[in-house]
């Protein structure tokens, strides 16, 4: 499953057929049905090219995408969230995070062994305890279209924006974060247990926020940009 996750991170347009061919080329004997089952379990689907870790909830309200053509020019203008699969030596977890688009600052993150919406609500509450963005962007997954989630945002006076179906570029900053976290930490460390993963990410995200210079930020850190933006706002 780790190989599938790593290849999908590089090639999110891979479906089960291409993934099976690639695994075979790497010397792994596996049939396509098994690859299909594993990709479904991991929430991965080659749909231009969005990983399908969540699906729209029946009867849930889907909000329009508010950010097409919008220039992101300040801290707190847009926050967004997403969920990704995290492989362990034995098993896996799901990771969700909230990121500020302008600064790339990770405001909050949380792990879960299921895709139950409660851990997304807990993540949202943790993020909102630190501030209120103007717009909060998500995909159309059941966790994020649930009335409990969107209601929290509306009650806080935050506009809700949702990606167009299958459009990963609508939430590109979180997608880039996942690639960075996986290649700089998760794949390198090869975490065996949930406590190890939790401790490891507990070290990595402060490093990402406060020590790792970001090319798109003129080699400043997300934390420096985020705090500077908050200071200007006040």
Question: Language-model features: where?
Answer:
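Charged DNA-binding/catalytic regions of mobile-element recombinases
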Residues: 1-234
